[in-house]
């Protein structure tokens, strides 16, 4: 059994909390894409655990965790994050964590060139805007992967005669191509191979053939949960390109990032924030550059876990959610942070786009069009009630249930979970048929 948790908007929907809620039922939690460019916080028994690269399943002491071949790994950050989690009391984490031998490596020079590229792009653009990269080197690493010049985990940990010398030579060639592209930037080449020679010994115990790992688990009928990174609207193919990440963050990335066939997937859970947020640049049709946006930002504490940047805020965009649903095929939804809307008298939701008076059939691929659309809103009544203490779905205010029902009817997918606060237990479950 393979179930999948995916973000349906622009990220930061609260995927980690749902994974944390579900993880006790699973034998394995796997990540399939991205790197340490995303982040979420899980609170267990009053202890906050910040996850960036590592799977959230580590909070369950009986769960194995895998970083799949689609993940890109900055090895120093891998160990720093692991040590930080261990210092907070995470038990037997090292014996439960595995890394695909096919995963690509992020180096420090990828991070340097990531920032240089961002500056270059902002200088070229007419409006001075940039992509909004986290500067973690994710894009440049996927770029070297696509150009077939990247280095993978197995290149680093290979013990065969001459393998280390080959690794250093390829590393040097990769660095030189970056210097040819961006000029002579500050970088201590002599120190880095020595650092990685130490890290390779530390990394070896974690490395597995992830294809064998996953298929053995499937054959053994293990319960597997895939933890998506980022979200569909940041997908390299289906997101608001070029204001996207560099990997496939939808259902397609699950298959290619873990090497599993489509028939193995059972449930696909779409995580949806009750309003909409976005970090970085790019079109955002329902953004509220007013007191409503500020109120959502303040009440929702909308700051990025990885970057600390303020998130842009706006009303729920059902055009986005319907588009996301078409691609990912959600079987049920988790609506998060519903409590942030508690004090709004009226709650608009975006239900269609038009441009120059002509209604669009679906979410447009052209950002020149998307940036000019007019949003039609359906205004729903608020509930003006604190819902953070409610423990059963049935006890939600009628207007809150009507809000959720409107979402269900619009996208044609049932709501199964509702987040009503930051605490681990603040998640209501609704039985679905």
Swiss-Prot record:
A single BP term in Gene Ontology: IMP metabolic process
Residues reported in the UniProt entry to bind GTP: 11-17, 39-41, 311, 337-339, 419-421
Main location: cytoplasm
Subcellular location: Cytoplasm
Residues involved in Mg(2+) binding: 12, 39
Annotated residues for binding of substrate: 305-311
Function description: Plays an important role in the de novo pathway and in the salvage pathway of purine nucleotide biosynthesis. Catalyzes the first committed step in the biosynthesis of AMP from IMP.
Entry similarity comment: Belongs to the adenylosuccinate synthetase family.
Protein name from the UniProt record: Adenylosuccinate synthetase
Lineage of origin: Eukaryota, Fungi, Dikarya, Ascomycota, Saccharomycotina
Originating gene: ADE12
């Amino acid at each position: 059994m393979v179930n999948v948790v995916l973000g349906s908007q622009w990220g930061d929907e609260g995927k980690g909390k749902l994974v944390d809620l579900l993880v006790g039922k699973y034998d394995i939690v796997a990540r399939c894409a991205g790197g340490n460019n995303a982040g979420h916080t899980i609170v267990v028994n009053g202890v906050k655990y910040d996850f960036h690269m590592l799977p959230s399943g580590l909070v369950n002491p009986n769960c194995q965790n895998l970083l799949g071949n689609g993940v890109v790994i900055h090895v120093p950050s891998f160990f720093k994050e692991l040590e930080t989690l261990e210092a907070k009391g995470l038990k037997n984490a090292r014996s439960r964590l595995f890394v695909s031998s096919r995963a690509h490596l992020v180096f420090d020079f990828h991070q340097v060139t990531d920032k240089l590229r961002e500056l270059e792009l902002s200088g070229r653009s007419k409006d001075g805007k940039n992509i909004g990269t986290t500067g973690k080197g994710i894009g440049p690493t996927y770029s070297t992967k696509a150009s077939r010049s990247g280095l993978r985990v197995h290149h680093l940990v290979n013990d065969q005669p001459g393998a280390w010398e080959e690794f250093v030579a390829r590393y040097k060639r990769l660095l030189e191509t970056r210097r040819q592209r961006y000029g002579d930037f500050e970088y201590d080449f002599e120190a880095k191979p020595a650092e990685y020679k130490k890290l390779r010994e530390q990394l070896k115990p974690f490395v597995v053939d992830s294809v064998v790992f996953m298929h053995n688990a499937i054959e053994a009928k293990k319960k597997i949960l895939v933890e998506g990174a980022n979200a569909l609207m940041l997908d390299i193919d289906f997101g608001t390109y070029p204001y996207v990440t560099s990997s496939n963050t939808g259902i397609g990335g699950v298959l290619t990032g873990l090497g599993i066939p489509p028939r193995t997937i059972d449930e696909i859970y779409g995580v949806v924030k009750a309003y909409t947020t976005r970090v970085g640049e790019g079109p955002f049709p329902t953004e509220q550059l007013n007191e409503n946006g500020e109120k959502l930002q303040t009440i929702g504490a909308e700051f990025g876990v990885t970057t600390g940047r303020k998130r842009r805020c706006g009303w729920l965009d059902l055009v986005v959610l319907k588009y996301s649903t078409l691609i990912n095929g959600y079987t049920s939804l988790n609506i998060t942070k519903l409590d942030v809307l508690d004090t709004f008298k009226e709650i608009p939701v975006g239900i269609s786009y038009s441009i120059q008076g002509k209604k669009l059939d679906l979410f447009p691929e052209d950002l020149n069009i998307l940036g000019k659309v007019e949003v039609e809103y359906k205004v729903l009544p608020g509930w003006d009630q604190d819902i953070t203490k409610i423990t059963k779905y049935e006890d939600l205010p009628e207007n809150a249930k009507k809000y959720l029902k409107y979402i269900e009817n619009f996208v044609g997918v049932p709501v199964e979970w509702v987040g009503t606060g930051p605490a681990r237990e603040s998640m209501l479950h609704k039985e679905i048929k």
